[in-house]
């Protein structure tokens, strides 16, 4: 016999919500479950390719492994050109 008042409430018709729509019902200890991805919009099941980046992890990966956007490369070139200019001016004084 289970002890009383130690188990969570069971909701046999808990709603699973994705993008504001109820996509399915299931049993859970929470009345509503909010998800970003489910089988109806997951790329594996839909046959499409989509990058879902909720916390900037893709950008962090791209920066870490040198696969930055072309816009970011232009800022790197500006920094390196400033170094070249300062080196050129110091060598001219010699």
UniProtKB/Swiss-Prot annotation:
Pfam families: Ribosomal_L31 (PF01197). The keyword Ribonucleoprotein applies. Residues 73-94 have a biased composition (Basic and acidic residues). Residues 64-94 are annotated as: Disordered. The keyword rRNA-binding applies. GO terms for cellular component: ribonucleoprotein complex; ribosome. One of its GO terms (molecular function) is rRNA binding. GO terms for biological process: translation. Keywords: Ribonucleoprotein, Ribosomal protein, RNA-binding, rRNA-binding. It comes from the Bacteria. Binds the 23S rRNA. Part of the 50S ribosomal subunit. Belongs to the bacterial ribosomal protein bL31 family. Type A subfamily. This is Large ribosomal subunit protein bL31. It comes from Prochlorococcus marinus (strain SARG / CCMP1375 / SS120).
